[in-house]
């Protein structure tokens, strides 16, 4: 299913729903996250599932194939979106929260590379011992290179994480530099999943590096993530109750819907009325013509 989502959805989107560079949004990179999530799940199963080496090797190989399938595409989408930004077509309104989605593939890819590298160094290749690639001598270089690649991927995720936060906060100021607040919409939920996988990769880095800095930073990220989730839940519930979040600020019953349609029609009628100057139906007299 992850392969179908990564290839199929991306193909359909590019062939039948291509919006052009100006219409491209970070949501385009969501299908590739499916493949990276499956790869991360494969690493978790191999580490904690107590599988035999004969079962671990296929999972590890397929997981690396999924990473190779998805991560370069995520890099390509991020590059195209950066071109979109340079073209002064940055998202506006509540859609600007979607910038955080660009952090998702790198956070999930970083975690997948780290945990798969750790599994390889635990001896799965050495115990399998078949072929040239799946041998004891290659386990160390492959595992450590995978962990290092995970660190690099987390660095790229950090760029998009900081970029999204700056963009969201910058939208809260007007042109005079005064704070005017942030607009809430369902797009704010775009912060949760990418923030979560970015935090998960940071937690894994803290374990592999035995680093207090990464451990403290991952704790701060986790606390902030919980706060964002709670705020989104409260504001979403409030928006649903009042109806503003789904365009039902006049109420949920049928009469309120009719009143809304009536008010909208009256506004349109008022906008269509023009002052009659008596010049709308006049025709310029031709030379030599008489009335």
What are these regions (language model features)?
Residues 21-43, 186-203:
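Intrinsic, low-complexity N-terminal interaction/targeting segments
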Residues 45, 54, 63, 70, ...:
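Membrane-interfacial loop- and helix-cap regions that link adjacent transmembrane helices
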Residues 252-291:
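Intrinsically disordered, low-complexity terminal tails of fungal membrane proteins
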Residues 22-30, 58-67, 93-101, 146-150, ...:
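Transmembrane alpha-helices of multi-pass eukaryotic membrane proteins
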Residues 1-33, 43-67, 86-94:
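Membrane-interface helix-loop-helix junctions at boundaries between adjacent transmembrane segments
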Residues 199-241:
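A generic transmembrane alpha-helix motif of multi-pass inner-membrane proteins
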Residues 37-46, 108-121, 195-209:
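Hydrophobic alpha-helical transmembrane segments in multi-pass integral membrane proteins
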């Amino acid at each position: 299913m992850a392969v179908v989502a990564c290839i199929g959805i991306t193909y359909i989107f590019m062939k039948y729903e291509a919006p052009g560079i100006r219409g491209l949004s970070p949501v385009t990179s969501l299908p590739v996250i499916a493949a990276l999530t499956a790869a991360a799940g494969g690493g978790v199963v191999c580490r904690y599932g107590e599988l035999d080496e004969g079962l671990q090797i296929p999972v590890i190989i397929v997981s690396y194939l999924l990473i190779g399938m998805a991560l370069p595409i995520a890099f390509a989408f991020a590059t195209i979106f950066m071109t979109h930004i340079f073209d002064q077509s940055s998202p506006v309104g509540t859609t600007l929260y979607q910038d955080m989605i660009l952090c998702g593939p790198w956070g999930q890819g970083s975690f997948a590379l780290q945990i798969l590298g750790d599994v390889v160094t635990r001896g799965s290749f050495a115990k399998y011992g078949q072929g040239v690639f799946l041998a004891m001598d290659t386990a160390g270089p492959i595992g450590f290179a995978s962990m290092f690649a995970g660190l690099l991927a987390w660095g790229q995720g950090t760029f998009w994480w900081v970029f999204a936060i700056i963009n969201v906060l910058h939208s809260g100021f007007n042109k005079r530099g005064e704070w005017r607040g942030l607009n809430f919409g369902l797009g704010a939920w775009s912060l949760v999943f990418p923030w979560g996988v970015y935090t998960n990769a940071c937690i894994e880095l803290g374990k592999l590096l035995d680093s207090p800095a990464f451990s403290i930073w991952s704790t701060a990220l986790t606390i902030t993530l919980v706060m964002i989730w709670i705020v989104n839940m409260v504001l979403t519930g409030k928006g649903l109750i009042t109806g503003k979040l789904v365009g039902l600020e006049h109420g949920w019953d049928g009469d309120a819907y009719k009143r809304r349609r009536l008010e909208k029609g009256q506004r349109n009628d008022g906008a269509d009325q023009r002052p009659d100057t008596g010049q709308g139906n006049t025709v310029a007299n031709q030379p030599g013509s008489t009335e």
